[in-house]
Structures are given as structure tokens and as C-alpha cells.
């Protein structure tokens, strides 16, 4: 049901830590894991495939960027749900059923991002939803960033998902579009989320 997609660029050890944390934490759903090795200096796809036979490691000889790497993974994905995760993320609990429950709570919901905590300070929040972009500064902020996690940030709609962790309905992405690749790195998920919103769909943050 679930296609987990992550992009690796000269990040073998981070990617291994991510895969190890996922395999040790997530048991609630069947999944495929697609790792896109996007132009790493060495062929890290081959190393990852040898280390983790259960994944599908795909090598791109050139660096496709954040959007291009994820789009390659989306095109290969067979699951009903896409979970795009940065390769420096570490899973700490199996919240997948709760995130899928949120995703399925309305036909209008296209995607959901979970609570994200700081790697160096696990009690500190990195993301609990986003504010809108300011029309004056064209900047926004992550709700709760730097605060101690005390369950003060309930589920709510968010204008943008967090690029480090985005769970999406594949049917909607197939209907709309892949992630825009013009940016190469940064802002592509904001543009993508803005487009998804304009097409009448909702995006949610869920603490799961």
C-alpha cells in the first residue's frame, strides 16, 4: 500500500541510519522502499542495494535535485500512498496508520506531514504546520519551531507540507502533477503545495 521514497546524494551513512530506523520502527503496513541515488560521486545505489536487499535502489548518473529525485521515485512507485522522506530523517515511532487515517478522512485531503522534531534536541519541535507566506516578505515560518513538545499543536490544515516528510495520495498526484523541477533545491515543495491547494485540495499537519 505504501511507497517510501528517499533521495540520496553522497549521503550513504545518513541513508543507512534512516533505513535502519524505519526497519526497526515500522511494522504496521506493507511497503516498498525506493532509494534514488542522485548523482553521488560513488555508486552508492549499489552499496545500498547490497546492504539492504529489501529496498529498490536506483542510480541516476547525474544529480537530479530534490524534486527530480523524488519525481523519479514517484514514477517507479506502485503504492496507493507516497511517503517522501529526507534521507537524514530518523523514525522514532510507527505513526503510519494515524497519518493514513488523516489522509483518508476526506476526499479533499491530498497530503499530510507529521510532527517533526529536531535531530540534535529530540524534545524540540522543528515543524508543527506552517504559516502562510507573507505577501510582503514572501517568507513564512514553521509553527512551534524550537518549542518543547508538550502536545500543544493539534492536527490542522496547513498551507504547505514539510519537504522532509510528506505523505500523499498517489491518485491525486497522478491527476495533478509531479513536483516542479525548475528550483532544483529549496522552494519546490512550496510551489507544489500552492498548486495542490489551488486545485481545491487540502494539506494537513498531524502530530500522529
Which residue ranges define each predicted feature?
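Short, acidic, metal-binding catalytic loop of nucleotide-sugar glycosyltransferases
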Residues: 20-30
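Short beta-strand/loop segment that forms part of the nucleotide-sugar
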Residues: 30-39, 58-60
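Acidic donor-binding/catalytic loop of UDP-sugar-dependent glycosyltransferases
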Residues: 43, 89-102
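Glycine-rich, basic loop-to-helix element that forms the pyrophosphate-binding segment
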Residues: 59-77, 87
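Short aromatic/hydrophobic "clamp" motif used to bind/position activated sugar donors
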Residues: 82
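Acidic/His-rich active-site region of diverse nucleotide-sugar glycosyltransferases
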Residues: 98-177, 182, 190
Amino acid at each position: 500500500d505504501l511507497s517510501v521514497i528517499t533521495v540520496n546524494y553522497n549521503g550513504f551513512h545518513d541513508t543507512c541510519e534512516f533505513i535502519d530506523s524505519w526497519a526497526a520502527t515500522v511494522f504496521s503496513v506493507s511497503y516498498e522502499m525506493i532509494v534514488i541515488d542522485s548523482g553521488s560521486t560513488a555508486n552508492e545505489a549499489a552499496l545500498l542495494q547490497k546492504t539492504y536487499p529489501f529496498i529498490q535502489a536506483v542510480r541516476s548518473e547525474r544529480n537530479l535535485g530534490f524534486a527530480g529525485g523524488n519525481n523519479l521515485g514517484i514514477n517507479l512507485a506502485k503504492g496507493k500512498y507516497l511517503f517522501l522522506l529526507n534521507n537524514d530523517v530518523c523514525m522514532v515511532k510507527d505513526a503510519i496508520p494515524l497519518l493514513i487515517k488523516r489522509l483518508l478522512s476526506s476526499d479533499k485531503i491530498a497530503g499530510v506531514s507529521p510532527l517533526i522534531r529536531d535531530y540534535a534536541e529530540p524534545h524540540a519541535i522543528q515543524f508543527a504546520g506552517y504559516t502562510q507566506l507573507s505577501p510582503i516578505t514572501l517568507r513564512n515560518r514553521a509553527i512551534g519551531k524550537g518549542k518543547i513538545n508538550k502536545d500543544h499543536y493539534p492536527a490542522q490544515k496547513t498551507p504547505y507540507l514539510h519537504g522532509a516528510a510528506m505523505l500523499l495520495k498517489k491518485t491525486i498526484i497522478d491527476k495533478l502533477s509531479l513536483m516542479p523541477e525548475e528550483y532544483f533545491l529549496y522552494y519546490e515543495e512550496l510551489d507544489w503545495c500552492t498548486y495542490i491547494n489551488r486545485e481545491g485540495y487540502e494539506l494537513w499537519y498531524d502530530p500522529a
